[in-house]
């Protein structure tokens, strides 16, 4: 009871928190986090909290850590923050940073499957096959965007045909219109990898 299941839990960490942890200083947690006059605020020992985070990550693989300022600095969509692509959150498990009304589209390429002669002295990574499959994966993810657009258009048509009054339907219609705009303009895809540890082990590489 009271436990989160079916999702990875991540902690959103800013540079000033990490600096406070390094310097063993106190850090103010607050809500809303970007408010000049927060409705809730509490000071915590940053170093002690950081040790607790990394201990639990070591012990149970939870929580993940999202270095938020690094994400904002290095995220390609944040180059277009003035056009509405500023990163504000992630999908439930934290794999992909998202701007408002954007969608989580993920595909993982299994790195272990590209190891030839695994767990032998002749083990090697098949880079040519990997490059070929990554290109196919990206092409497929882009096609998924078009399928998503079709579904959103059907949802919008359904909203329009519903018998409810326009004042009732307006909120839902505007929501899906915003999602459609982000989908067609940004066309964000999330091609990632999995089984990195298995790949390294199969190649006899320590990490």
Residue spans of the language-model regions?
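Core structural elements
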Residues: 143, 147-149, 154-203
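Intrinsic disorder at enzyme termini
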Residues: 25, 29-34, 189, 198, ...
């Amino acid at each position: 009871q009271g436990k989160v299941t079916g999702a990875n839990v991540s902690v959103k960490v800013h540079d000033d928190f990490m600096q406070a942890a390094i310097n063993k200083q106190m850090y103010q947690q607050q809500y809303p986090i970007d408010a000049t006059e927060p409705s809730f605020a509490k000071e915590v020992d940053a170093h002690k909290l950081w040790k607790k985070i990394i201990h639990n990550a070591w012990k149970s693989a939870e929580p993940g850590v999202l270095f938020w300022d690094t994400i904002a600095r290095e995220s390609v969509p944040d180059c277009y923050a003035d056009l509405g692509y500023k990163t504000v959150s992630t999908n439930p498990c934290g794999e992909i940073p998202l701007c408002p009304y954007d969608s989580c589209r993920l595909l993982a390429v299994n790195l272990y499957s590209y190891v030839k002669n695994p767990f032998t002295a002749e083990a090697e990574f098949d880079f040519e096959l990997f490059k070929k499959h990554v290109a196919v994966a990206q092409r497929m993810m882009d096609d998924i965007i078009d399928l998503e657009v079709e579904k959103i258009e059907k949802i919008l048509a359904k909203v329009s045909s519903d018998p409810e009054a326009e004042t009732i339907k307006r909120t839902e219609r505007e929501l899906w219109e915003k999602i459609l705009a982000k989908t067609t303009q940004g066309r964000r895809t999330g091609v990632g990898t999995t089984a990195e540890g298995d790949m390294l082990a199969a190649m006899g590489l320590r990490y």
